[in-house]
Design a protein with these regions (language model features):
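Alpha-helical transmembrane segments of multipass membrane proteins
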Residues: 17-25, 92, 96-97, 144, ...
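Hydrophobic alpha-helical membrane-embedded segments
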Residues: 8-33
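Intramembrane alpha-helical segments
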Residues: 79-153
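Short, hydrophobic transmembrane alpha-helix segments
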Residues: 2-7
Length: 226
């Protein structure tokens, strides 16, 4: 029974880290939210909400109705065609993350706050026409590792260090995919640091496996330069 419960928790963690958090990052950092909010105002055709009985145009209720109609027209003409579906997907992913966080141990919930901060940085970078591979690596790999650890064990500083090492390596992989400088240095140093940390923690099997993967990876890297 304990093994079945652990497998269920592991499956929920994978859903949280990969499906919910991954979707949130893709939508937050991959959608031009600020551009969608800044265009199309005022709308060419306001909305047509019905006027309340006995409402004068210059009365506060009349002014509020005109503003609501303009907002409705802007939503229909500009925002919804550009980012409406992305917004619905974002809300669905946020709801999924909230439900999974309630089902999983409470120790994982602070990670959602860290994710929200990373999402804000990703959206801000997108506004400037840039991407944020470091934030993507932290969200996908660093937080994912911590979620898996906290689901089964209390918080530990060594686990956080290992998460940073793996995120550093993932950052290098993302920079390598974008053909940016320093990618191999980040990729290799992150894995070397992770293997050294595992060896220091007297975990020879995972440390050895990671070292073997690193050796094979380094052996293939000269072909990338050519």
């Amino acid at each position: 029974r304990a093994e079945g419960a652990d497998l269920l928790i592991l499956a929920l963690v994978l859903l949280l880290a990969d499906l919910a958090w991954g979707t949130l990052w893709d939508l937050a950092a991959g959608t031009d939210w600020f551009g969608s909010l800044a265009t199309g105002w005022p709308p060419r055709q306001p909305g047509s909400l019905p006027r309340l009985p006995y409402t004068q145009r210059r009365a506060p209720a009349g002014r509020l109705l005109r503003r609501l109609n303009r907002l409705l027209g802007w939503w229909r003409e500009s925002f919804w065609p550009q980012a409406g579906r992305a917004l619905l997907s974002l809300l669905a992913a946020a709801l999924l993350a909230a439900v999974l966080s309630l089902l999983l141990p409470a120790a994982l919930r602070p990670l959602n706050a860290v994710l929200v901060a990373l999402l804000g940085l990703g959206a801000a970078a997108r506004r400037r026409g840039m991407d944020l591979p470091a934030g993507e690596a932290l969200a996908a790999v660093g937080l994912g590792w911590l979620a898996g650890h906290l689901a089964f064990a209390p918080p530990e500083g060594t686990s956080a260090l290992l998460a940073l090492c793996l995120a550093l390596s993932a950052w290098g992989g993302l920079r390598l995919a974008r053909a940016r400088r320093g990618a191999l240095l980040l990729l290799n140093s992150g894995q070397m640091a992770a293997a050294a940390l595992l060896a220091a923690l007297q975990q020879p099997l995972p440390a050895g496996l990671l070292a073997l993967l690193l050796l094979g990876q380094v052996a293939l890297q000269p072909s990338l330069a050519s």
